[in-house]
């Protein structure tokens, strides 16, 4: 696959980028170089190679999930102007 000036102008239009006519040739060459590199990567035989998830092998420490209120309800509502039984009280806005 290769890119031509018409394609560059269309991409620029879709991206809402102003490109002058004297720039299209340079940008076309850069796009084609990127596509050629991607084609080279596509030609590499990776059969039998395990997918690389991370460069450094890591295992995450896990913990058992437990549901709690955090024992911080009083701290959370401490700055509220009006509360009742650890709930925020607000004025009625909509009838």
From Swiss-Prot:
Gene Ontology MF annotations: asparaginyl-tRNA synthase (glutamine-hydrolyzing) activity; ATP binding; glutaminyl-tRNA synthase (glutamine-hydrolyzing) activity
GO biological process, one term: regulation of translational fidelity
Alphabetized Gene3D superfamilies for the sequence: Glu-tRNAGln amidotransferase C subunit, N-terminal domain
Domain of life where this protein originates: Bacteria
Cross-referenced InterPro entries: Asp/Glu-ADT_sf_sub_c (IPR036113), GatC (IPR003837)
Keywords tagged on the record: ATP-binding, Ligase, Nucleotide-binding, Protein biosynthesis
Reactions catalysed according to its record: L-glutamyl-tRNA(Gln) + L-glutamine + ATP + H2O = L-glutaminyl-tRNA(Gln) + L-glutamate + ADP + phosphate + H(+); L-aspartyl-tRNA(Asn) + L-glutamine + ATP + H2O = L-asparaginyl-tRNA(Asn) + L-glutamate + ADP + phosphate + 2 H(+)
Enzyme class: ligase
Enzyme Commission number(s) from the entry: 6.3.5.-
PANTHER family found in the cross-reference section: GLUTAMYL-TRNA(GLN) AMIDOTRANSFERASE SUBUNIT C, MITOCHONDRIAL (PTHR15004:SF0)
Quaternary context: Heterotrimer of A, B and C subunits.
Family designation: Belongs to the GatC family.
Entry-linked HAMAP family: GatC (MF_00122)
Role: Allows the formation of correctly charged Asn-tRNA(Asn) or Gln-tRNA(Gln) through the transamidation of misacylated Asp-tRNA(Asn) or Glu-tRNA(Gln) in organisms which lack either or both of asparaginyl-tRNA or glutaminyl-tRNA synthetases. The reaction takes place in the presence of glutamine and ATP through an activated phospho-Asp-tRNA(Asn) or phospho-Glu-tRNA(Gln).
This protein's name: Aspartyl/glutamyl-tRNA(Asn/Gln) amidotransferase subunit C
Organism: Bartonella bacilliformis (strain ATCC 35685 / KC583 / Herrer 020/F12,63)
């Amino acid at each position: 696959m290769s890119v031509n000036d018409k394609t560059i102008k269309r991409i620029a239009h879709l991206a809402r980028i102003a490109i002058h006519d004297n720039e299209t040739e340079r940008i076309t060459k850069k796009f084609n170089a990127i596509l050629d590199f991607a084609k080279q990567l596509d030609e590499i035989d990776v059969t039998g190679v395990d997918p690389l998830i991370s460069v450094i092998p890591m295992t995450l420490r896990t913990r058992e999930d437990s549901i709690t209120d955090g024992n911080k309800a009083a701290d959370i509502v401490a700055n509220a102007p009006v509360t009742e039984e650890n709930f925020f009280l607000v004025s009625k806005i909509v009838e």
